């Protein structure tokens, strides 16, 4: 049995070699000749999986080590009898911590407390719900917008997007990309919505580029009305609007979900799915794969305030480290993908063990995802 894996999928060779012969290949584009001699294909979001890629090949299973699946024609795979698995929620924590890193940076720069802000979360799935939990642990007011969940009668106080535009100081988008249908998210933030944003609002897009109308956003920024913008995703990736990048506060190369833990979760989830598909079910403990982090233990004296949280969060991951490299190479063909391929190792907050002499600080850090313990001072 031969399994093709994206060369940038961590731990893929190590895991899938337990099931068969593994060949690592580039994800964009996948070499067609390899597909003609393989049984399974494991991809990331850069690979478009559809009839034109797989028709006539012996591939009988596709796994994507990503939460999003808009790069996969699931209907065609089903019709063709090809097994499929994604990795829902694999990088949700990474995206939440990206949003926090950006918000804590902007709060320090502009001198505001997050507790004084109302944060509107658009899309309350794996990412949005975790973001809500962590924000509320800090006592921050959140407003939720998720029309499909509201229509299903899911538990939660769901608002309309209009209400979020009127009331929220931060709008952060965490939806899938739906190009049509009743819950279309293509240009969910369209020209009308962007024009209506209050001065000083923070707009964050870390889901899919086309959820926000990039041309309309640039027009608003060029009009000189104050708006803080954080973009990890862009229309037309890997090509992006360089003028828009120059106008935003933070711009990164679709890496919000790129923690080592998130990537490893993605690989292990599709590995477990494929092992079950071929009747050789296996489970993988994530901690057995991960190396020791750069920083792994620290002592915190006293209570946890916003500046201290920012320093702890940025000790693990400061979003600015990914903003500067993109600005340096923006507009040069191939560089966007290169930044993603050669991405510096990044860990999640759970990799940092924090000893606190303040019991309340330890409890709060645990709720925020840090590995914290109360250690009374002697």
UniProtKB/Swiss-Prot annotation:
Pathway this chain belongs to: Cofactor biosynthesis; pyridoxine 5'-phosphate biosynthesis; pyridoxine 5'-phosphate from D-erythrose 4-phosphate: step 2/5
Pfam name, any one: 2-Hacid_dh_C
Disulfide bonds: none
Any single Gene Ontology cellular-component annotation: cytosol
CDD domains in the cross-refs: ErythrP_dh (cd12158)
Keyword Transit peptide: no
Keyword Mitochondrion carried by entry: no
EC number: 1.1.1.290
Keywords, comma-separated and alphabetical: Cytoplasm, NAD, Oxidoreductase, Pyridoxine biosynthesis
Domain of life: Bacteria
Gene Ontology biological process terms in this record: 'de novo' pyridoxal 5'-phosphate biosynthetic process; pyridoxine biosynthetic process
Active site: 208, 237, 254 (proton donor)
Reaction(s) catalysed (UniProt annotation): 4-phospho-D-erythronate + NAD(+) = (R)-3-hydroxy-2-oxo-4-phosphooxybutanoate + NADH + H(+)
Primary localisation category: cytoplasm
Gene3D superfamilies: 3.30.1370.170, NAD(P)-binding Rossmann-like Domain (3.40.50.720)
Amino-acid positions noted as binding NAD(+) in the UniProt annotation, renumbered to this chain: 146, 175, 232, 257
Residues reported to bind substrate: 45, 66, 258
Family that this chain belongs to: Belongs to the D-isomer specific 2-hydroxyacid dehydrogenase family. PdxB subfamily.
NCBIfam families, alphabetized: PRK00257.1, PRK15438.1
Summary of the function given for this chain in its UniProt record: Catalyzes the oxidation of erythronate-4-phosphate to 3-hydroxy-2-oxo-4-phosphonooxybutanoate.
Protein's name according to its UniProt entry: Erythronate-4-phosphate dehydrogenase
UniProt organism field: Salmonella paratyphi A (strain AKU_12601)
Organism taxonomic ancestry: Bacteria, Pseudomonadati, Pseudomonadota, Gammaproteobacteria, Enterobacterales
């Amino acid at each position: 049995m031969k399994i093709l894996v994206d060369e940038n999928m961590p731990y893929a060779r190590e895991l899938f070699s337990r099931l068969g012969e593994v060949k690592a290949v580039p994800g964009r584009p996948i070499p067609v000749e390899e597909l003609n001699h393989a049984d399974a294909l494991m991809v990331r979001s850069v690979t478009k999986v559809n009839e034109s890629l797989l028709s006539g090949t012996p591939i009988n299973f596709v796994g994507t080590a990503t939460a999003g699946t808009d790069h996969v024609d699931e209907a065609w795979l089903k019709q063709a009898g090809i097994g499929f698995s994604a990795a829902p929620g694999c990088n949700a924590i990474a995206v939440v911590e990206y949003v926090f890193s950006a918000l804590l940076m902007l709060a320090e720069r502009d001198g505001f407390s997050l507790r004084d802000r109302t944060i509107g979360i658009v899309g309350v799935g794996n990412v949005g719900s975790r973001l809500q939990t962590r924000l509320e642990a800090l006592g921050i007011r959140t407003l939720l917008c998720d029309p499909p969940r509201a229509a299903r009668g899911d538990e939660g106080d769901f608002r309309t997007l209009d209400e979020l535009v009127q009331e929220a100081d931060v709008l952060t988008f965490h939806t899938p990309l739906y190009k049509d249908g009743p819950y279309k998210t293509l240009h969910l933030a369209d020209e009308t919505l962007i024009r209506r944003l209050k001065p000083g609002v923070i707009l964050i897009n870390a889901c899919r580029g086309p959820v926000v109308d990039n041309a309309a956003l640039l027009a608003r920024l060029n009009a000189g009305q104050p708006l803080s913008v954080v973009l990890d995703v862009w229309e037309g990736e890997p090509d992006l609007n360089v003028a828009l990048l120059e106008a935003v506060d933070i711009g990164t190369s679709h890496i919000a979900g790129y923690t080592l833990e998130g990537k490893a979760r993605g690989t292990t989830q599709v590995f477990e799915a494929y092992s079950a598909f071929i009747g050789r079910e296996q489970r993988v403990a994530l901690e057995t794969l991960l190396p020791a982090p750069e920083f792994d233990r620290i002592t915190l004296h006293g209570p946890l305030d916003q500046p201290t949280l920012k320093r702890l969060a940025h000790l693990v991951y400061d979003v600015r480290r990914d903003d500067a490299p993109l600005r340096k190479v923006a507009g040069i063909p191939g560089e966007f993908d290169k930044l993603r391929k050669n991405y510096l190792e990044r860990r999640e907050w759970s990799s940092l063990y924090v000893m606190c002499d303040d019991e309340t600080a330890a409890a709060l850090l645990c709720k925020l995802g840090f590995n914290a313990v109360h250690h009374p001072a002697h």
